[in-house]
Amino acid sequence: MLFLDKGRIEALRRRLIEWYRVYGDKDLPWRNTADPWAILVAAFLLRKTTARQVVRVYEEFLRRYPNPKALASAREDEVRELIRPLGIEHQRAKHLIELAKHIEARYGGRIPCSKEKLKELPGVGDYIASEVLLAACGSPEPLLDRNMIRILERVLGVKSAKKRPHTDPKMWSTARRIVPKDPDMAKEFNYGMLDLARKICTARKPLCTECPLNDICIYYNND
């Protein structure tokens, strides 16, 4: 098991949450709901587009299709037209309707709070399953994507031997140890990770002098 400095982890948690409360994108509607269907819809709409683009169609989408049953019986051309501003609307509409039909047929329209069962849904992998568990089921799951991985690598020196670190079970295990156990704090921590990586700890030319983690960051202090 990888050794992680407890003091550094505590500082990482505290500062990320404090930073998120001031600078994070707390107004995003899917961050203010515990409805698993709304969270799944957001996850599918957010693929290959930006949060600000999704905001424009998200609430109208949920107004028309407030549950899996409503979307399962929808016409694909109507769904495509609604989400056209996001791009790849043919693929996106097909996958969303397929997801809704599967939830209706398999679970009677109820979305399970089980990672194994969530991952059986079409188009749902570890990350989206974790999103649902975190936001709808009160489970302190990590949202391990390239953004969180970048911060783990830079701040804590956590490295994966795999070419695709987000598929590395060891990275998932490490991330779970870092996420706070309190469900509300776990959400703030994860969202703080995503926002900090997008705004400050960017892949190229990170704004290290503006980062709340710079004095505990291995990357910054070894640069």
Curated annotation (Swiss-Prot):
Binds 1 [4Fe-4S] cluster. The cluster has a structural role. Optimum temperature is 65-70 degrees Celsius. Its cofactor is [4Fe-4S] cluster. It catalyses: Hydrolyzes mismatched double-stranded DNA and polynucleotides, releasing free thymine. Thymine cleavage is completely inhibited by Ni(2+), Co(2+), Zn(2+), Cu(2+) and Mn(2+). Activity is not affected by Mg(2+) and Ca(2+). It is an enzyme of class 3 (hydrolase). DNA glycosylase that excises thymine from T/G mismatches. Also has a weak DNA glycosylase activity on uracil paired with various bases. This is Thymine-DNA glycosylase.
